[in-house]
């Protein structure tokens, strides 16, 4: 797996017949929003009431399209270049 696209976790098990092109990492969250709503303003009116809503939020990291693979790097692929910093001092 070192030189392959390791976009999925190593613990992922594929079921037979499952489409491998549609796999990705799926994370889902719920955002809960509580609001206090009142009617009538200062002069009276109806009592306040609470309103709660849960909003589903799904984050997905899909497999990159064919041709946009991440390239594995090894120590032989890394090129180190050294640059020297030139100090420019102006005299007044």
From Swiss-Prot:
UniProt-listed InterPro entries: Arrestin, Arrestin-like_C, Ig_E-set
Tissues and organs where the protein is expressed, per its UniProt entry: Retina and pineal gland.
MF annotations from Gene Ontology: opsin binding; phosphoprotein binding; protein domain specific binding
GO biological process: endocytosis; negative regulation of signal transduction; signal transduction; visual perception
One cellular component term from this protein's GO annotations in UniProt: photoreceptor inner segment
Record's keyword terms, sorted: Cell projection, Disulfide bond, Sensory transduction, Vision
SUPFAM superfamilies named in the record: E set domains
Record bears the keyword Disulfide bond: yes
Subcellular locations according to the entry: Photoreceptor inner segment; Cell projection, Cilium, Photoreceptor outer segment
Assembly behavior: Homodimer; disulfide-linked in response to retinal illumination. Interacts with CXCR4; the interaction is dependent on the C-terminal phosphorylation of CXCR4 and modulates the calcium ion mobilization activity of CXCR4. Interacts with GPR84.
Function statement: May play a role in an as yet undefined retina-specific signal transduction. Could bind to photoactivated-phosphorylated red/green opsins.
Protein family: Belongs to the arrestin family.
Name this polypeptide is given: Arrestin-C
Organism whose genome encodes this protein: Rattus norvegicus
Lineage of origin: Eukaryota, Metazoa, Chordata, Craniata, Vertebrata
Gene: Arr3
């Amino acid at each position: 797996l070192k030189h392959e696209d390791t976009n999925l976790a190593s613990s992922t098990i594929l079921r037979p017949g499952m489409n491998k092109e549609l796999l990705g990492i799926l994370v889902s969250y719920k955002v809960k929003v509580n609001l206090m709503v009142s009617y009538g303003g200062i002069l009276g009116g109806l009592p306040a009431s609470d309103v709660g809503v849960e909003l589903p939020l799904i984050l997905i990291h899909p497999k990159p399209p064919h041709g946009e693979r991440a390239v594995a790097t090894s120590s032989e692929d890394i090129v180190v270049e050294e640059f020297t910093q030139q100090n420019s001092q102006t005299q007044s």
